[in-house]
């Protein structure tokens, strides 16, 4: 049986239905999928579970508003200095790679993490390496890609954000350069990412043939309809739409 290792920033029952549907289709085609992802407490896409063996790495345990922010800052500090988040992902993947004969590694993210964990694993194993970027930092008008505010002085926030953005882009682009293939969600994304890897493929987001399919309706009138897809980001809730 063909086996695939997926390393991603989030996975159902939390967000990232793109990877959830991929696993659903791959299992139908006879593939066995292993997913290593960050633990996120959310059940929005619970209906997409059960199609892969999922291993979650938990970074955050605090429950209070203030303690959550402090913990987030601490994890970010450890990650910047020591690559903390990447090392935990790598440590979770190593025993899986040793006991399974994977055909390739796929890393999906909306920003950079966990590309910097998937890259050395792909290089070390010499497995085909595919990167899937659901969103890219360049598409944001401001700093919406950062999940928390730093809450320091305004000038210091601006300095930290600028350095943080530059660091994320550098790490992402370094990973793209060694990927065998890159997939993304729109023609514009393709053109941006081709600067770092010439083999970029377009796979549109938000389409599932089980939900959207042609249906014949008997009617005496000619009706024009339109279909729209609303992208729900991980930090948003439906009532905000």
Specify the residue positions occupied by each region the protein language model found:
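Membrane-proximal helix-turn-helix segments that form the acceptor-binding/catalytic region
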Residues: 113-116, 120-124, 137-140, 152-182
């Amino acid at each position: 049986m063909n086996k695939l290792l997926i390393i991603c920033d989030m996975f159902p029952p939390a967000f990232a239905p793109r990877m959830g549907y991929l696993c659903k289709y791959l299992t139908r085609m006879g593939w066995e999928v292993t997913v290593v992802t960050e633990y996120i407490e959310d059940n929005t896409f619970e209906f997409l579970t059960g199609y892969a063996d999922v291993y979650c790495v938990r970074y955050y345990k605090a429950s209070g508003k203030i303690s959550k922010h402090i913990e987030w800052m601490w994890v970010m500090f450890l990650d910047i200095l020591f690559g903390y988040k990447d090392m935990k992902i790598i440590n979770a993947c190593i025993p899986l790679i040793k006991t399974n004969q994977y055909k390739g590694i796929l890393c999906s993210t909306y920003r950079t993490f966990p590309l910097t964990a998937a890259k050395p694993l792909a290089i070390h194993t010499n497995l085909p390496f595919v990167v899937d970027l659901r969103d890219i930092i360049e598409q944001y008008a401001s700093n919406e890609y950062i999940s928390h505010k730093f809450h320091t002085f305004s000038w210091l926030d601006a300095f930290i954000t600028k350095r943080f953005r530059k660091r994320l882009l550098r790490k992402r682009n370094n990973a793209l350069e060694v990927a065998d293939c890159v997939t993304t969600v729109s023609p514009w994304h393709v053109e941006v990412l081709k600067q770092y890897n010439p083999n970029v493929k377009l796979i549109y987001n938000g389409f599932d043939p089980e939900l959207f399919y042609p249906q014949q309706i008997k009617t005496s009138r000619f009706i024009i309809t339109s279909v729209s897809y609303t992208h729900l980001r991980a930090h948003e809730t439906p009532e905000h739409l």
